[in-house]
Each structure stands twice: as structure tokens, then as C-alpha cells.
């Protein structure tokens, strides 16, 4: 019987689409705009499958097989990706094309295939642009299992080293410490450099400079020979005696030498050279450089659309695609046609370069810094400018410079003056932020050999020999790369771990080991020399590269290393005496809660004071650095941090006393007003100490400011722009 008016319920249908899985939401947002409505782009938020943090999870008895689990907090994300995969026509895995990205793609594929039979494809690209994404969709590739195995070997190796060394450090030194295959080598390098710095004894020496004039144009020259001998003097008296030998002599230009040379543009950035340049030019830490580069790579809104501005930023290759070379040459031909070489410039890859990616370059050279700066943050535009200038310059003609040297003879003395001028701009024409700083303007007057020049003034200048300098972010990255330690993706995290663990501190951009870092490094160097040996670590990196090239099996690398290492750990754990409490130091500070004396201890973030009756009394407080200089205030000055983690120094009696300074107090006392001294620095005299009291102009004498005189420090460096707002509410 038919019942009119009743219709069968219509089943809801899901419009099946293509699913693209990337690592980050920002990357997903950019790519989704390129692909249109037939694609859904989702982020895995990094690894969804990894080793558990709570246990070793390596089956040593069965070829070191890792026991993976779903990463804590990622189960819901993985569930959603599986559900979307089942509803999709096909799945594209678009994680990064390095080892970590390949492992992410592999684990996602395994998880999805266990849940549904939706076709899964791997796509790779070097830049996030519409053309690159569509080309990758049209040309999927197999998952690189050799690269996955290299990541697995690295992960297992680091887990074995960490999970054996960390308990040893906890048991013998203190809880919460860590050690790692790469970070411990970097720590050793920093500690060894610190020893070299401490051992170095500066030696005084003097040079002589003369001021000459020709046709009313003055120029300076350095005394290089006196009576046929090198003009370097051990004391001011020797320099003064030498001046007396020629001060009344006639000065003539005895020789003029001129030569020209080509200056080749530098190759495009790799991860290492980008971090070094950003540190030197912009003052960026390695971590900040990579964070900003990640933002530029994943995509930035340019008003009407979102675009990835640079290619993948973790690379050790200087290779550039032919399409990019063609594009930049067309741009140069339009804007600097006379600086376009006849053929493209080619740059040789280093021996250990993986060459999987291109060099770091802008995705569109037409996006000049001036054109897009309104859409970028200050940090983004500064880093982008470095990358853009370096890439464009790399495909321009050589610059040509002329070096002109005068030798001037005055009696038994020979002076030398040199200037370097650019005679053909070449690639210098495009450089603004990266313009060279070592090229001088014309300073030497036109003259001929044999002509007389007037010697107006002679002065002796004090110097001290320069010893080894502490590592900075730039120099430690350069050293790690030169030694073959780590890979582009590990440089910034390695430095960050050392800082976060308080093994190293960064003071005025210099990396200095803490007492804790020195103890850890000494212990590991003494008992685990192979693990923290530079050449051993470099060889291990080479073996991981061979795994990636499918030349050796990943578990063979582990098997060659683990037995001897495990035996060594057991021996040290048994024989090494405990070092717990080695940093503890009794003080005369009284506990404010129980009246017992406080003990100076070393924690994760530096020294602090703890009650001597711990655990009965758990009172802690910062270590006092100085007495508060305020009249009638009995508080102490301690280190504090703002919400933005910037350090400053204030009184313990805040808010009753609101004394604040941003300069680090020393334990020294001003001999004039009895306030404490603080550390300061400027480019002219380096680091020095000065009184915190703005009414007192005391500056402690140092080797550097002795050579310039006290006035050189006070002429605006000590009481200048740097001091404004540095000491607040003093009166």
C-alpha cells in the first residue's frame, strides 16, 4: 500500500576531497589558499609517533628496534587525520624533505594505512609557492626509506647516549642534568676555548703613526721600518726613542704600489652561513634566526594573498634551480644590466653537503625588500633583506677594487699608507645591508715617487696582543660546521639546550661556560672521551649520511657503538665518587623564616640561596650581588627577570625601595662613593666597570681604556645614551 506524502530520507553525502598533511598550521594556511576547494590541508603539529619520554624504549636484544608510541597530546590530532583520510579521495604527505620530515611522513603513512585503504602519496617541494605546490601534487615520489632509517639511527643513538649518561650525572653530580651526543661536544669546545681565554696573558706593544700633508690634504701612515728593522716596540720609551731618529728628517714618497683585483660575490646562504651572517649583522641568536626564517618560509600575508617568501631554510647546499637563476638574471638585466655576467655564476658544493635542497633564496626575486617591507615585521624584513641581497648579488658580476700603497721615507724610518677603492661596483650595486665595511674612500693625495710630503705630527700608540676570543652564536656554528658536527637542523637547538640547561651563559653575545657546565664537560671528557671527541662525532655524522645514502644498515651503526659505550657507563657508575654538593657554599646570610644560615647552591638557572635546614625549611632567595646604594635602605641587589625574560637588577625590599639598574653589579666597591660597580661595555674600549651612582664619574682603569685615557671612556660612553633609563629612581 502506497502512502502518499512520505518520501524516503535522503542520505547525507560527503563531498570527497584530497587531503594534504603538513607539519604546521601556518604552512597549512598558506598551501590551502593555493590548492582551492578540492583540497583540505591539515597540520600534524610535528611528530605524531615517537619514542616515549619515560623509558628507554629500545629493544637492545633485537637489533636495537625502537618501540614507538603516539606522542602524548597528539592522539586526537592523529584520530582526526585518520578520519579525514578515510573520507578523502587520496592523501598527500607534504612534510619537510629532510630526515625528520621523511620520518613524519613515514609514521603518518603507517598509521593511516592501518586504519583505511585510501591511496597515500608523498610530495616534496623546496618553496611554498603556487607553482611549486602544484608541481609537487602532479609528481608524487615514494617515501625515502633510507632517509627514514637515517633518522631512526640518529634517534636511537641519541636516546642510548642520553638515557645512559643522564642517570650517571643525576647520581654523581645533581638531578635534572642532561648530556647528548652533539650538545656535549659543543659544550667541550666552549669550555676548551674558555681555558684558552683564561690562560692568555696580554703583552704590551707600541706602534708609531705619522700624519702627513700633501697639497693641503692630510693622511695617516704607519711606521713599518726603523733602521731596517720591524717597527714594533715593547714600551713607550722605545717608541719615543725611535721617533727621535727621524722627527727632524725630510719625508719623501719613496715608492707607490698599485694593484687591482676582482672580488667575487659570495654564494647564496646555507643554514650555517645564514645564522652566522644574521648574528654578525643583525645580532640575532641562532634560535631567533631560524624562528624568523621559518615564518618567511611558511608564508606571510602580503595584503591580498599569502605567500612563502623564502625557500626551505635547513640546507647545506648552495645549489640553485635553473628556473630561479633564469628569474634573477632577468631581474638583474632590467635593473643593473651592466652587472649581468655573460653566463650564470656557479658555486661548488662542499664535500659533505647533502645537496637535497636548494640554497636559501627568495621565492620571487621581484618581491624586493622595499616592495614588501610594509607587510613584514622588523625582524622579518631585516632577515629577508639579507637573504634577498645575498642571492641577487650571487648572480651579478665581480666587483673590481684597486689597492694603492704609499711608502714614505723619513731618514731611517719607512711609513706605509694604504687605501682601497672600488673602481667597478659589480655586485656591490645591489648591496645595502650587506655592503662591505672594509672599503675606504680616497684618502691619499695625488703624488709621484720622490715628491716631498710634510710630516706634521707623530704619535705613539699603545696596544695589547689579542688572545683567543670566546665563541659567539656565529663562531660556534661555524666551528660545528667546519668540524662536521651536527647538521643544519641541529645547530640552533644545540646552542639553545646548552643555554636552557645552564651549562652555558650568553654575556654580551659571548658564550661562556658556567661552573656546572665546566664540571659536566670535564667529567665527560675524562671518562667518555670518545663520546665527546670532535672527530668521533664527525665520523658518526658521516655514518648517518651513509645510512641515508643506503650504503650501510642503520642498526650496524648502533651495534658498532653501543657495547663499548654501555660497558664504560657501568664502570664509571661503579668507580666514580659522588660529586653531589660540590657547588654548595655556606654564607652569612640569615634565613628570614627560621633564622638558620643560608647555603649557596647551584640550580638549573644559576646560583641561589637555600636554607641550611632543608627540607625542614624550604625558604630560598636569589644570591645578593651587592648592597642597595639607596641611603637608609638595608636591602640587597639581586637579579630579576621581566615577563619577557629580560634580566635586570633590583632591590629585595621592592616595592618599598624601587631601585633598578640594567647593568650587572660586580662585587667591587667604588673607591670614591662606596656604591657598587657595574659592568659596562662599548665599541671603543670594550668591557669596563663603572660606578652605579649617576652622580659619581668613577671608571675603573683597564688595559683597554688605559690606552685611550680615562676621558675616552667618559666622553659619552660611560655617561651617554646607553645610561639613559639604566638607573631609575636613584635619589
UniProtKB/Swiss-Prot annotation:
Mg(2+) binds at residues 23, 96. Residues 17-130 form the Toprim domain. Residues 178-183 are annotated as: Interaction with DNA. GO terms for molecular function: DNA binding; DNA topoisomerase type I (single strand cut, ATP-independent) activity; zinc ion binding. It is an enzyme of class 5 (isomerase). GO terms for cellular component: chromosome. Keywords: DNA-binding, Isomerase, Magnesium, Metal-binding, Repeat, Topoisomerase, Zinc, Zinc-finger. It holds the Pfam family Zn_ribbon_Top1. InterPro entries: Topo_IA, Topo_IA_2, Topo_IA_AS, Topo_IA_cen, Topo_IA_cen_sub1, Topo_IA_cen_sub2, Topo_IA_cen_sub3, Topo_IA_core_domain. Its EC number is 5.6.2.1. Releases the supercoiling and torsional tension of DNA, which is introduced during the DNA replication and transcription, by transiently cleaving and rejoining one strand of the DNA duplex. Introduces a single-strand break via transesterification at a target site in duplex DNA. The scissile phosphodiester is attacked by the catalytic tyrosine of the enzyme, resulting in the formation of a DNA-(5'-phosphotyrosyl)-enzyme intermediate and the expulsion of a 3'-OH DNA strand. The free DNA strand then undergoes passage around the unbroken strand, thus removing DNA supercoils. PANTHER family: DNA TOPOISOMERASE, DNA TOPOISOMERASE, TYPE IA, CORE. NCBIfam families: topA_bact (TIGR01051). This is DNA topoisomerase 1.
Amino acid at each position: 500500500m502506497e502512502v502518499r506524502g512520505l518520501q524516503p530520507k535522503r542520505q547525507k553525502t560527503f563531498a570527497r576531497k584530497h587531503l594534504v598533511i603538513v607539519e604546521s598550521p601556518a604552512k597549512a594556511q598558506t598551501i590551502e589558499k593555493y590548492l582551492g576547494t578540492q583540497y583540505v590541508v591539515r597540520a600534524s603539529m610535528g611528530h605524531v609517533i615517537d619514542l616515549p619520554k619515560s623509558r628507554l624504549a629500545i629493544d637492545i636484544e633485537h637489533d636495537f628496534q625502537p618501540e614507538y608510541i603516539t606522542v602524548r597530546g597528539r592522539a586526537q590530532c592523529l584520530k582526526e587525520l585518520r578520519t579525514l583520510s578515510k573520507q578523502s579521495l587520496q592523501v598527500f604527505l607534504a612534510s619537510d624533505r629532510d630526515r625528520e620530515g621523511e620520518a613524519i611522513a613515514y609514521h603518518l603513512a603507517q598509521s593511516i594505512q592501518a586504519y583505511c585503504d585510501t591511496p597515500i602519496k608523498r610530495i616534496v617541494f623546496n618553496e611554498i609557492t603556487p607553482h611549486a605546490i602544484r608541481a609537487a601534487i602532479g609528481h608524487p615520489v615514494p617515501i625515502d626509506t633510507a632517509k627514514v632509517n637515517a633518522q631512526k639511527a640518529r634517534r636511537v643513538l641519541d636516546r642510548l647516549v642520553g638515557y645512559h649518561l643522564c642517570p650517571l650525572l643525576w647520581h654523581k653530580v645533581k638531578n635534572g642534568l642532561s648530556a647528548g651526543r652533539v650538545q656535549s661536544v659543543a659544550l667541550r669546545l666552549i669550555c676548551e676555548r674558555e681555558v684558552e681565554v683564561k690562560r692568555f696573558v696580554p703583552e704590551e706593544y707600541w706602534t708609531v703613526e705619522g700624519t702627513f700633508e700633501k697639497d693641503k690634504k692630510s693622511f695617516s701612515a704607519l711606521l713599518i721600518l726603523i733602521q731596517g728593522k720591524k717597527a714594533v716596540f715593547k714600551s713607550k720609551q722605545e717608541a719615543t726613542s725611535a721617533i727621535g731618529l727621524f722627527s727632524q728628517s725630510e719625508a719623501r714618497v719613496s715608492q707607490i704600489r698599485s694593484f687591482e683585483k676582482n672580488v667575487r660575490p659570495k654564494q647564496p646562504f646555507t643554514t650555517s652561513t645564514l645564522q652566522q651572517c644574521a648574528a654578525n649583522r643583525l645580532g640575532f641568536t641562532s634560535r631567533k634566526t631560524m624562528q624568523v626564517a621559518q615564518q618567511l618560509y611558511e608564508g606571510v600575508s602580503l595584503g591580498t594573498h599569502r605567500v612563502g617568501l623564502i625557500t626551505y631554510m635547513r640546507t647545506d647546499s648552495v645549489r640553485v634551480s635553473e628556473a630561479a637563476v633564469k628569474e634573477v638574471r632577468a631581474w638583474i638585466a632590467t635593473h643593473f644590466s651592466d652587472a649581468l655576467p655573460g653566463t650564470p655564476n656557479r658555486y661548488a658544493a662542499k664535500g659533505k653537503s647533502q645537496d637535497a635542497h636548494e640554497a636559501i633564496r627568495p621565492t620571487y626575486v621581484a618581491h624586493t625588500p622595499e616592495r614588501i617591507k610594509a607587510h613584514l615585521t622588523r625582524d622579518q624584513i631585516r632577515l629577508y633583506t639579507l637573504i634577498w641581497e645575498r642571492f641577487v648579488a650571487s648572480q651579478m658580476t665581480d666587483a673590481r677594487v684597486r689597492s694603492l700603497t704609499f711608502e714614505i721615507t723619513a731618514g731611517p724610518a719607512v711609513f706605509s699608507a694604504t687605501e682601497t677603492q672600488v673602481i667597478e661596483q659589480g655586485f656591490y650595486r645591489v648591496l645595502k645591508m650587506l655592503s662591505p665595511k672594509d672599503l675606504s674612500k680616497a684618502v691619499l693625495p695625488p703624488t709621484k715617487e720622490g715628491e716631498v710630503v710634510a710630516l706634521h705630527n707623530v704619535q705613539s700608540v699603545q696596544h695589547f696582543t689579542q688572545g683567543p676570543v670566546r665563541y659567539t652564536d656565529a663562531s660556534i656554528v661555524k666551528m660545528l660546521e667546519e668540524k662536521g658536527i651536527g647538521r643544519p637542523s641541529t645547530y640552533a637547538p644545540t646552542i639553545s639546550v646548552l643555554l636552557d640547561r645552564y651549562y652555558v651563559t650568553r654575556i654580551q653575545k659571548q658564550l661562556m661556560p658556567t661552573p656546572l657546565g665546566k664540571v659536566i664537560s670535564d667529567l665527560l671528557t675524562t671518562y667518555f672521551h670518545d663520546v665527546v671527541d670532535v672527530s668521533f662525532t664527525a665520523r658518526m655524522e658521516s655514518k648517518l649520511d651513509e645510512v641515508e645514502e643506503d650504503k650501510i644498515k642503520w642498526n650496524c651503526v648502533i651495534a658498532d657503538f653501543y657495547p663499548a659505550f654501555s660497558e664504560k657507563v657501568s664502570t664509571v657508575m661503579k668507580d666514580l665518587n659522588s660529586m653531589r654538593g660540590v657547588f654548595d657554599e655556606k654564607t652569612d646570610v640569615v634565613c628570614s623564616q627560621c633564622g638558620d644560615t643560608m647555603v649557596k647552591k647551584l640550580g638549573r638557572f644559576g646560583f641561589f640561596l637555600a636554607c641550611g635546614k632543608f627540607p625542614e625549611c624550604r625558604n630560598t632567595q636569589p644570591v645578593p650581588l651587592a648592597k642597595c646604594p639607596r641611603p637608609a635602605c638595608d636591602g640587597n641587589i639581586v637579579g630579576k627577570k621581566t615577563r619577557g625574560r629580560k634580566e635586570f637588577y633590583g632591590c629585595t625590599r621592592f616595592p618599598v625601595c624601587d631601585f633598578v639598574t640594567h647593568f650587572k653589579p660586580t662585587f667591587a666597591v667604588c673607591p670614591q662613593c662606596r656604591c657598587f660597580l657595574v659592568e659596562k661595555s662599548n665599541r671603543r674600549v670594550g668591557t669596563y666597570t663603572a660606578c652605579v651612582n649617576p652622580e659619581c664619574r668613577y671608571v675603573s682603569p683597564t688595559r683597554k681604556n688605559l690606552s685611550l685615557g680615562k676621558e675616552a671612556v667618559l666622553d659619552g660612553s660611560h655617561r651617554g645614551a646607553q645610561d639613559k633609563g639604566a638607573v631609575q629612581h636613584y635619589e
